[in-house]
From Swiss-Prot:
SMART domains from the UniProt entry: MUTSac, MUTSd
Similarity comment text for this entry: Belongs to the DNA mismatch repair MutS family.
Stored InterPro entries: DNA_mismatch_repair_MutS, DNA_mismatch_repair_MutS-lik_N, DNA_mismatch_repair_MutS/MSH, DNA_mismatch_repair_MutS_C, DNA_mismatch_repair_MutS_clamp, DNA_mismatch_repair_MutS_core, DNA_mismatch_repair_MutS_N, DNA_mismatch_repair_MutS_sf
The organism of origin for this protein: Parabacteroides distasonis (strain ATCC 8503 / DSM 20701 / CIP 104284 / JCM 5825 / NCTC 11152)
Keyword Transcription regulation: no
NCBIfam families the UniProt entry points to: mutS1, PRK05399.1
Residues the entry annotates as binding ATP: G616, P617, N618, M619, A620, G621, K622, S623
The protein's name: DNA mismatch repair protein MutS
GO molecular function, one term: mismatched DNA binding
Keywords annotated in UniProt: ATP-binding, DNA damage, DNA repair, DNA-binding, Nucleotide-binding
A GO cellular component annotation in the UniProt record: cytosol
An example Gene Ontology biological process: mismatch repair
């Protein structure tokens, strides 16, 4: 882009652009927002608008693209969703009042993580900005949703921070400059990151910002004073808000600690494989989709967080259950609350807009409607007699004074923009009423003048009109221009008519136009005074929004339970999971009409049945059974009713899944490496209160490697002295059925099938005992495999089975392992073979507890070389 002698406008543009080189600059010129240079090229492509050129000095030009200023709300979201930071540069003075270049400046910097624009935000999700501060072994992290005022912090291991990033899904992450590689190594490349200077991430700078914002002497009142790394991350967020011109943030009233010990640990693999809030394909259905019957945006956002952060304490779970139970017993109350919740709207985000000074007149009216609806909700809660609902009712505040003031001062159906006028109600301000009388009676006055002049001049076609060039005028056709009085002043000659002005019209014009300007200024002032008064009500209205969200979530649970025939589970501190007639909440909703879901029982405890090995053919329903057990457990621990005939859930502290293939090929990891990494994470972090799901572990390697690893992992879980994790282990390795004989808390089950001739019918029923057949060839046939391949597969299978029987392979080595199992040792390492003896010694000397996944893989390769001699 050539640049020699710039025009004053372009010089002003480049000066402002230099301060925000990493943002697309929307530069206000008259009624348009314009982009220049590279911004124009990028913006035109994203927005699908025409790219053109603007003159920039003699013989120079610059690329340009733009759109009308009133279309900002349509185009801005497209830029932000494309991952762009957008600097909005407005005219800071009225062009009519200056003969020089209009002053311009940045009024807002919108980024993916910092926005209050409704067209950018998803009302069902939070829009979090995150900040991370790295130390040697741990990190501090902070999350802020400027659209709701929620501000949270935590610190912990890389693994814990990764879990939080996955669950909160921030739209933007702030990091120290130069830490991009470290961040991506720890958390992957999936986040939009922005680098800030190192000095911003210092203790003193961060504490100063936080104390200044909250106007406190220390942070003890927030319970975060010991989270030094979290405080640094939080301070960086406040700095970033200041840099992006978001300085009015009185709605950020607290910094809360994310309490790790309150919630069940769900890693990103578990959240993804259980499809809790999202699906693996566009056509899928998540758990959230099934149980989300919320009405308010606050309820939708809260339910999403409840699902991702199940509770570990029995008491708050039971309190939620009691409310859901109450709604079942009192359908009239449920109906009343439903009706009132529909009136609430996005109370949380509206009051945040009040704080930042971006609330519209219509949103203020919606605020009034919401506060009016809170009164009957409060009364219903207080009258319920249910302790949790009564506590909610006590805290709800209808804010009657400000509600009544809005009712009195704002028209019921105002325009969305202040500058459109017609906002302030009649009778609020005497001066405003007088000005309106002048401005709005103008039409009648002009009609009277027009009729009078027709009668005086005898010109029947005479008419009075207005344009922006010379204001009010009288138009007379040429056939009557000889009748025009001498005191009329001619202003314009048309083909068929002449236009005139009079002193009377000019005086009236000044009066009426002056009145309109004064009306707009006065309405704007009165509206801003009301908004300022509203800022005093931010804390109670934020509390209302939170409580409404809670009621909405619990109502949603009741509606989902009623619609889907869920029951109330017993939740306790026991060590058992006892599910009778359990169903998969998502799959049962996808079955064809009239087809029943085959329910199954699952029982796990620490004494008799800690581990269930599930065998059965592919497509029989093993994976669904694993997932439904985890989902029922999770639903119980968020206070929801569950799809079962009965359920007793002993609290779990962590849910682990190794379900399905999840190759991370993009970073060079194979299926097997991913399996081993995930399995290692489970084995190193499980406790006696954990629920562990393994589905087809070992598929990424050879059969005997797979069997060996699967056996060793199951044995390790069974024999671990301090972590008897309740485990469901689905496998196609039927050899693992032998483990039941050697380990008292391992039990075999299979998902039953029925053979009819050459066909297989999947019964999908879990029954005791192992399965000896995989029916893989039957599944291939069902999948439409060519008949010749199916036939040849059967021939090869029979040949292999015959050879194995002749050589005595089938079952014998595995049974030998089971019968001689001792401690952690696998019995086939006790055979009289010098090579296997060497392997046994290698494994004996391993420090399993301190072995990293990579070291384990290298050791496996070394053992393979010993066995194969290669």
């Amino acid at each position: 882009m050539a640049k020699v002698v710039e025009t004053p406008l372009m010089k002003q543009y480049f000066d402002i652009k230099a301060k925000h080189p990493d943002a697309i600059l929307l530069f206000r010129v008259g009624d348009f927002y314009e982009m220049y240079g590279e911004d124009a090229v990028i913006g035109a492509e994203i927005l699908g608008i025409v790219q053109t050129k603007r003159a920039n000095g003699v013989g120079q030009h610059v690329e340009m693209a733009g759109f009308p200023h009133h279309a900002l709300d349509s185009y801005l979201p497209k830029l932000v969703r494309a991952g762009k930071r957008v600097a909005i540069c407005d005219q800071l003075e009225d062009p009519k009042l200056t003969k020089k270049l209009v002053k311009r400046g940045i009024t807002e910097l919108v980024t993916p993580g910092v926005s209050i624009n409704d067209n950018i935000l998803n009302h069902k999700e939070n829009n979090f900005l995150a900040s991370i501060h790295f130390a040697k072994e741990v990190c501090g992290i902070s999350f802020l949703d400027i659209s709701t005022g929620e501000f949270m912090t935590a610190e912990g291991s890389i693994d814990y921070i990764d879990k939080l990033l996955n669950n909160f899904s921030p739209k933007e992450v702030l990091i120290e400059r130069g830490n991009k590689k470290r961040f991506e190594e720890a958390f992957g490349p999936r986040f939009f990151i922005f680098e800030l200077d190192d000095w911003i991430f210092t203790t003193s700078a961060a504490e100063d910002r936080l104390l200044k914002h909250f106007e406190t002497k220390n942070l003890k009142g927030f319970g975060v004073q010991h989270l030094k790394l979290g405080i640094i991350a939080s301070g960086a967020i406040l700095y970033y808000l200041d840099q992006t011109q978001h300085t009015h943030i009185s709605h950020i009233t607290a910094l809360s600690r994310i309490e790790e010990d309150r919630y069940v640990r769900l890693d990103k693999f578990t959240v993804r494989s259980l499809e809790l809030v999202g699906t693996m394909n566009d056509e899928g259905t998540s758990l959230l989709d099934v149980i989300d019957k919320t009405i308010s945006p606050m309820g939708s956002r809260m339910l999403r967080r409840w699902i991702l952060f199940p509770l570990k304490d029995v008491k708050p779970i039971q309190e939620r259950q009691e409310v859901v139970d109450y709604f079942f017993r009192e359908p009239e109350t449920k109906e009343l609350l439903d009706t009132q919740l529909e009136q609430i709207g996005d109370l949380e985000r509206i009051i945040s807009k009040v704080a930042v000074g971006r609330v519209s007149p219509r949103e203020v009216v919606q605020l009034k409607v919401a506060l009016r609806a809170i009164e009957p909700i409060k009364e219903a809660c207080m009258a319920s007699g249910e302790p949790s609902l009564c506590r909610i009712g006590e805290q709800l505040n209808a804010c009657a004074l400000i509600r009544d003031r809005i009712e009195k001062e704002i028209n019921n159906d105002p325009p969305s923009l202040v500058n459109k006028g017609g906002i302030i109600a009649k009778g609020v301000n005497e001066e405003l009423d007088d000005l309106r009388a002048i401005a709005y009676s103008g039409k009648d006055y002009l009609l009277k003048v027009q009729q009078r002049e027709i009668e005086l001049t005898g010109i029947p076609s005479l008419k009075i009109a207005f344009n922006n060039v010379f204001g009010y005028y009288i138009e007379v056709r040429n056939t009557h221009k000889d009748k025009v009085p001498a005191n009329w002043i001619r202003k314009q000659t048309l083909v068929n008519a002449e236009r005139y002005i009079t002193e009377e019209l000019k005086e009236y014009e000044e009066k009426i136009l002056g009145a309109e300007e004064k009306i707009l200024a006065l309405e704007t002032r009165l509206f801003n005074e009301l908004v300022l008064a509203l800022t005093e009500y931010i804390p109670p209205i934020q509390m209302n929004a939170n409580l409404i969200g809670r009621i909405d979530c619990l109502l949603s649970f009741a509606k989902a339970a009623e619609a889907n025939k869920y029951i109330r589970p017993v939740v306790s501190d026991s060590d058992k999971i006892d599910i009778k007639g359990g169903r998969h909440p998502v799959i049962e909703k996808q079955l064809p009409l009239g087809e029943p879901y085959i329910a199954n029982d699952v029982y796990l405890d620490d004494e008799k049945q800690q581990i269930i090995i599930i065998t059965g053919p592919n497509m029989a329903g093993k994976s669904a059974l694993l997932r439904q057990t985890a989902l029922i457990t999770l639903m119980a621990q968020i206070g929801c009713f569950v799809p079962a005939e009965s359920a007793h859930i002993g609290i779990v502290d962590k849910i682990f899944t190794r379900v399905g293939a999840s190759d991370n090929i993009s970073v060079g990891e194979s299926t097997f490496m991913v399996e081993m990494n995930e399995a290692s994470d489970i084995l190193n972090n499980m406790t006696s209160r954990s629920l562990v799901l393994f589905d087809e572990l070992g598929r990424g390697t050879s059969t005997y490697d797979g069997i060996s690893i699967a056996w060793a992992i199951v044995e390790y879980i069974h024999e671990h002295p301090n972590a008897k994790a309740k485990t469901l282990f689905a496998t196609h390795y039927h050899e693992l059925n032998e483990m039941e004989r050697a380990f008292k808390r391992i039990k075999n089950y299979n998902v039953s099938v029925k053979e009819v001739g050459n066909k297989v019918i999947f019964l999908r029923k879990l029954i005791p005992g192992g399965s000896e057949h995989s029916f893989g060839i039957h599944v291939a046939k069902m999948a439409g495999m060519p008949k010749s391949i199916v036939k040849r597969s059967n021939e090869i299978l029979k040949q292999l089975e015959s050879e194995n029987r002749q050589e005595g392979i089938t079952g014998k080595p595995v049974k030998a392992i089971a019968s001689a199992a001792e401690g952690y040792q696998l019995s086939f390492f006790q055979l009289d073979d010098p090579v296997l003896s060497q392997v046994r010694d290698e494994i004996k000397n391993l420090d399993v507890n301190n072995l990293t996944p990579l070291e384990a893989l290298n050791k496996l390769i070394e053992i393979k070389r010993i066995i194969t001699g290669k």
